[in-house]
């Protein structure tokens, strides 16, 4: 062996290296994705699902913080059958010493989604009720939305709201 490469050999090994690098990135993939926002009125896009935190309210009579969220199941969504199931399992609310999750201080309602599904291209509004949480008394409150809570729970959208942001944005409930 002379230690020299012909142009043809060089191109062949360069192509093989490129294929190997591309193949290894496909095998490892992306392990997680947590989109983060810090203000009300902002949107996150995860798995082609766009979620927007529209408003935060506080119901003092019931000691409940209410998050109004719109969810749009985007075109070409990466979800099975292109329909997105949304219920209490899709959300958590955390704060210092506080957790609301499915079956624990958390309730989700929607005036739009009668069957808890957001079909491809549709937008639905959801109200996430965190019972026992006075967000104005916490330094930081985080709302997390999981488009696929079971299979891909590492892919999520988050709104980390500080006390200062909440003081500016929080309102009293405007509906019954």
Regions found by a protein language model. Name each.
Residues 119-176:
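Surface-exposed edge beta-strand/loop patches
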Residues 65-73:
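Short, well-ordered beta-strand segments enriched in hydrophobic/aromatic residues
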Residues 1-21, 25:
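N-terminal secretory signal peptides and thylakoid transit peptides that target proteins
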Residues 62-66, 140:
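A generic structural signal for beta-strand entry/edge sites
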Residues 35-60:
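Low-complexity, acidic Ser/Thr/Pro/Gly-rich terminal tails and inter-domain linkers that flank the onset
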Residues 59, 74-124:
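The feature marks short-to-medium sequence segments in extracytoplasmic or secretory-pathway proteins
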Residues 57, 71, 83-85, 130-132, ...:
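A mature extracytoplasmic/lumenal domain signature
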């Amino acid at each position: 062996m002379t230690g020299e490469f012909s142009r043809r050999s060089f191109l062949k090994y360069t192509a093989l290296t490129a294929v190997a690098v591309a193949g290894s990135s496909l095998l490892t993939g992306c392990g997680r994705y947590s989109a983060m926002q810090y203000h009300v009125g902002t949107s996150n896009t995860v798995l082609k699902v766009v979620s927007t935190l529209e408003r935060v309210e506080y119901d003092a009579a019931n000691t409940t913080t209410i998050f109004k969220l719109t969810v749009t199941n985007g075109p070409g969504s990466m979800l099975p059958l292109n329909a997105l199931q949304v219920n209490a399992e899709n959300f958590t609310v955390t704060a210092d010493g506080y957790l609301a999750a499915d079956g624990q201080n958390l309730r989700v309602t929607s005036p739009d989604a009668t069957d808890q599904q957001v079909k491809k291209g549709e937008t639905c509004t959801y109200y996430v009720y965190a019972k026992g949480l006075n967000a104005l008394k916490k330094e930081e409150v985080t709302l997390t939305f999981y488009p696929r809570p079971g299979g891909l729970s590492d892919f999520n959208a988050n709104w980390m709201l500080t006390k200062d942001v909440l003081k500016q944005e929080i309102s009293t409930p405007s509906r019954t």
